[in-house]
Amino acid sequence: MLTMENVTALRMRRHCLTRRAGAAEYDALYLDLSPGLNVHWHGFGQPPCLVERADFDDVEYNGRRQRQRILVKGRFQNGNIGFVEAAQMELFAGLYRRPYKPTEHSELLRELIGREGPLNIEAMKRMTGLLVKQITPALHRLQEAFLVFEDQFDGEWDRGWYLFDEMFPDVDPARISRTEALLRVLPRLAHRQVYLTAADAKDFYGLPARDVAAAMEELARQGILVRWRE
């Protein structure tokens, strides 16, 4: 029978904290803990990393994966920037896509990017007469709806913005529902955490508590997750 002491030991092992991961094991860990985040003390544009998990320089490794567009940028947990594998974009779009509420500025930029893109913010400013403080929130609104994509493949400031479906023609952001996406990602996180509460999962994914709790109940009903017994 598992005790909390056993849980802690197994969690540390599964998070590669007691023995650092090689590349294949690291890729699996990154997938299970996605979206990957920038460490808060890193400089602008630095790749995401999993601190103290890899037996190699994972900042350099993930930088290479960014340049190859294996890792791509989006706005996920509560609108925060994160990086996921491009092959997982449809799943995370289903998990995080927000309903699009158009504004005058967001529609102007969406049409402009569709006609002239890719464009950086400086070009948008020049072509529309809008200020950066007007452009940025409009782009974030479009980004959170998975209507535009910011191509941050290196640490430079001069990043191009594309229509989402131009960069991901085979991805339908509406194909996977949030419920279905949660049923896929929660077992990944539970495997790494060993013991996972709905509150923990809510905090990790930045999603409504009721959605997370309902998905965990369904996974328990299916026998994929097992309820903890004291």
What are the functions of these language-model segments?
Residues 1-230:
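Long, low-complexity intrinsically disordered regions
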